Amino acid sequence: MPETRLIDGRDMLPPEPLELALAELGRLAPGDELLLLLHCEPLPLYAILERDGYRYHAVLRADGSHEIRINKP
């Protein structure tokens, strides 16, 4: 059954959220989802996701934080 994993990086300083996200991507099984909550848009992460074939959807939330949902194909 697909699993959703959460990294709430809103209280972390860069590059910690990016490092945690990259480590977690290596653990995702096909169909799993990684949910990131961040105060800034992770532009370097987007390039990595596109290069490696991950699907993602990013939303700017009402509180100004960014919600990024990443799926392993």
Model-derived regions: residue spans:
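Residues that cap or initiate secondary-structure elements
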Residues: L13, P42-P44, A62-G64
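C-terminal edge-of-domain segments
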Residues: G53-P73
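Short aromatic/hydrophobic contact patches that present stacked aromatics
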Residues: L6, L35, E67
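Sterically constrained small-residue positions within well-ordered secondary structures
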Residues: R27, A47, V59-R61
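An N-terminal amphipathic alpha-helical segment
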Residues: M1-R27
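Short, structured protein-protein interaction patches enriched in aromatics and acidic/basic residues
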Residues: L35-R55
